């Protein structure tokens, strides 16, 4: 159970009551506690979350017929985020081309991948053969040209509009015309990033959360010119990667970062007004 939930303690109370009293009294007490719980704001919130998670992963207007098979992926940027994203694909059995301009950073990323999988073997999470398979499926390189046969490339470089625009242009220059390009930006305007490209319909957002190979949430961002084909593909890809893939629109910080940004401001406002959240 999660901290603060009412139902687990109610279950304990009902069980204790059933031991200490007769059958009829226990049934009546259990019914009373159930009515309290099922009509509580907490129950309403939990039901909303349950159905919202399922609706959010199935955006309207997208068809499974438009999903493009992803047989090989590219990741540009071998920092913490790029390394984690590469492992997301490797974990799903998708070979990865990892592009990084800094040779030292690239070597460090490859070592991190190997160390992570060695630890997984030591802890019994994967077999040694799986470790070798995943490591062999990673192709580290300094050259954008190595992306030529990728079905999708995820950009995961520094959060700077100019830097990302240059990187995206280099990616597009070396990709097939039908390949998809995803940016991992956490707050930049996807439409502005795609504006200078020849095929903006192939550009989408895939906002992973760090550590990318562990965190389940994935914000797939719908740009103004993102094609239904591109959007349907990243939704299906998110599921294949084992993520809760939620489609969001272009906005400042999208959804998760926007909530995170606003929460401290709300808390500070309460503190300044000497207001407790319970009030």
Where are the language model's segments positioned?
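Conserved N-terminal Rossmann-fold NAD(P) cofactor-binding segment
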Residues: 103-151, 161-166
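Intrinsically disordered, low-complexity segments enriched in small/flexible residues
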Residues: 1-69
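Substrate-binding/catalytic subdomain of NAD(P)-dependent oxidoreductase enzymes
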Residues: 19-38, 221, 225, 245-279
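NAD(P)+-binding Rossmann beta1-loop-alpha1 motif at the extreme N-terminus of oxidoreductases
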Residues: 55-116, 139
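Phosphate-coordination loops involved in phosphoryl transfer and adenosine-cofactor binding
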Residues: 67-72, 135, 150, 178
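Short glycine-/small-residue-rich Rossmann-like dinucleotide-binding loops
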Residues: 157-158, 186
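Rossmann-fold NAD(P)-binding glycine/threonine-rich loop
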Residues: 165-237
């Amino acid at each position: 159970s999660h901290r603060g939930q009412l139902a687990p303690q109610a279950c304990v109370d009902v069980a204790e009551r059933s031991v200490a009293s007769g059958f009829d009294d226990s049934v009546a007490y259990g019914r009373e506690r159930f009515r309290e719980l099922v009509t509580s704001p907490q129950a309403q919130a939990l039901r909303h979350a349950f159905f919202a998670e399922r609706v959010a992963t199935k955006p309207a207007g997208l068809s499974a017929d438009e999903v493009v098979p992803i047989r090989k992926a590219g990741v540009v940027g071998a920092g913490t985020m790029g390394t984690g994203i590469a492992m997301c694909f490797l974990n799903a059995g998708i070979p990865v081309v990892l592009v990084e301009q800094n040779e030292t950073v690239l070597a460090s990323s490859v070592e991190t991948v190997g160390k992570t999988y060695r630890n997984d073997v030591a802890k019994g999470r994967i077999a040694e053969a799986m470790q070798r398979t995943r490591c062999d499926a990673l192709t580290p390189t300094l050259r954008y040209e190595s992306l030529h046969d990728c079905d999708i490339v995820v950009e995961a470089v520094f959060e700077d509009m100019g830097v990302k625009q240059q990187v995206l242009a280099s990616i597009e220059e070396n990709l097939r015309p039908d390949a998809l390009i995803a940016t991992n930006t956490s707050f930049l305007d996807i439409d502005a990033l795609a504006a200078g490209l020849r095929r903006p319909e192939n550009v989408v957002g895939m906002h992973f959360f760090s550590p990318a190979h562990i965190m389940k949430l994935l914000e797939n961002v719908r740009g103004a010119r993102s094609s239904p084909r591109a959007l349907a593909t990243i939704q299906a890809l998110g599921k294949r990667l084992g993520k809760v893939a939620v489609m969001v629109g272009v906005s400042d910080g999208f959804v998760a970062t926007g909530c995170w940004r606003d929460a401290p401001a709300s808390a500070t406002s309460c503190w300044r007004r000497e207001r407790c959240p319970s009030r």
